[in-house]
């Protein structure tokens, strides 16, 4: 990140993403999962009972199991997870585009932490920090916990910076246009028109929605708006929505991505999948969708499977974030 004089640069933008292990070894994965799955926003359960289950059953099993999956998607050239690599590059590009702002990034879980980056920004002279959670759709399990951590950090500071936040952008025109254009460009590269474009969002326990989490509604709004942008141009393509990454025995938001893909496979359909809830490619897209779901889809009789990459560190993503920020806070020139 660029270094700025505190005398002239007092506003900063902090991009926040979910997080990642430092490496793909068991110890690193276990440490990351423990922090992530210990967040009461993520797992709503009896804290004493959950702590026992987490430490004695889940962490030993999942940490070891995930070594192979993380190793499969790891960016070995830069020794970083894809999520970290793309988020870092995204922040760098946005930093270059915003001359009058310090732009940095942090992870809610793992490194670099929100606490360390707030300190770094203050050291550079930032007296106002604009928090930008890179989750288009709001959920207490993602967006809210970013702000929980921000205010936990602030509660320990004697000199607190002013904090502002960028709203969830699930229905923002710049987001909808960018996702729509991304799908169009991908479809142009294909040899034939697919039968279906499936919008796969990360899942959520249904009881969270029943308690008032708006995530389900936000996902459907994104899906509907993008569909409206595309359906006239592609009348022969079905656009559908599903939820992936179910964890545990509870009922999650439906329909499940696995179930929908198996239905399409039995009908020998060709499918294009996009995961518009993820700002950067990660385990859930590069392994779960691109490998596991694809293999199962083909095995069950599916014709063709194509995954659209996340926006990652693309110029389109940088421009989209710039426009959203400018729309919300009227960037100083």
UniProtKB/Swiss-Prot annotation:
GO cellular component, one term: cytoplasm
Lineage: Bacteria, Pseudomonadati, Pseudomonadota, Gammaproteobacteria, Thiotrichales
EC nos: 4.98.1.1
UniProt xrefs under InterPro entries: Ferrochelatase (IPR001015), Ferrochelatase_AS (IPR019772), Ferrochelatase_C (IPR033644), Ferrochelatase_N (IPR033659)
GO molecular function, one term: metal ion binding
Highest taxon listed in the record's lineage: Bacteria
Pathway the protein takes part in: Porphyrin-containing compound metabolism; protoheme biosynthesis; protoheme from protoporphyrin-IX: step 1/1
Protein location: Cytoplasm
Residues binding Fe cation, per UniProt: 202, 284
Protein name according to UniProt: Ferrochelatase
Gene of this entry: hemH
Function description: Catalyzes the ferrous insertion into protoporphyrin IX.
Cited Gene3D superfamilies: 3.40.50.1400
Catalytic activity entry: heme b + 2 H(+) = protoporphyrin IX + Fe(2+)
Similarity-based family: Belongs to the ferrochelatase family.
One of the protein's GO biological processes: heme biosynthetic process
Keywords from the UniProt entry: Cytoplasm, Heme biosynthesis, Iron, Lyase, Metal-binding, Porphyrin biosynthesis
Record-linked PANTHER family: FERROCHELATASE, FERROCHELATASE, MITOCHONDRIAL
Disulphide bridges, residue numbers: none
């Amino acid at each position: 990140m660029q270094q700025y004089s505190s005398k002239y640069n007092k506003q900063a933008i902090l991009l926040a993403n979910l997080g990642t292990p430092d490496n793909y070894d068991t110890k690193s994965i276990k440490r990351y999962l423990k922090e992530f799955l210990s967040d009461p926003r993520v797992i709503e359960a009896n804290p004493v009972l959950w702590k026992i289950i987490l430490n004695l059953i889940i962490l030993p099993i999942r940490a070891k199991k995930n070594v192979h999956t993380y190793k499969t998607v790891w960016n070995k050239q830069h020794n970083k997870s894809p999520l970290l690599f793309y988020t870092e590059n995204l922040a760098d590009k946005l930093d270059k585009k915003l001359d009058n702002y310090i732009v940095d990034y942090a992870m809610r879980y793992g490194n670099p932490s929100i606490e360390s980056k707030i300190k770094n920004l203050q050291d550079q002279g930032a007296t106002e920090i604009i928090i930008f959670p890179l989750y288009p759709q709001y959920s207490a399990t993602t967006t809210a916990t970013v702000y929980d951590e921000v205010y936990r950090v602030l509660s320990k500071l004697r000199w607190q910076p002013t904090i502002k936040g960028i709203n969830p952008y699930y229905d923002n025109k710049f987001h909808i246009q960018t996702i729509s254009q991304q799908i169009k460009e991908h479809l142009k590269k294909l040899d034939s028109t697919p039968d279906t474009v499936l919008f796969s969002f990360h899942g959520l326990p249904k009881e969270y929605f029943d308690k008032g989490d708006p995530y389900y509604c936000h996902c459907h709004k994104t899906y509907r708006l993008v569909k409206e942008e595309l359906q006239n141009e592609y009348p022969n393509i079905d656009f559908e929505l599903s939820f992936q990454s179910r964890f545990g025995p509870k009922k999650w938001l439906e329909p499940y991505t696995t179930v929908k893909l198996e239905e399409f496979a039995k009908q020998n359909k060709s499918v294009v999948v996009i995961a518009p809830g993820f700002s950067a490619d990660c385990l859930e897209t590069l392994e779960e969708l691109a490998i596991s779901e694809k293999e199962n889809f083909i095995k069950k009789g599916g014709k063709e499977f194509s995954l659209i990459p996340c926006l990652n560190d693309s110029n389109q993503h940088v421009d989209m974030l710039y426009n959203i920020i400018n729309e919300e806070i009227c960037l100083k020139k």
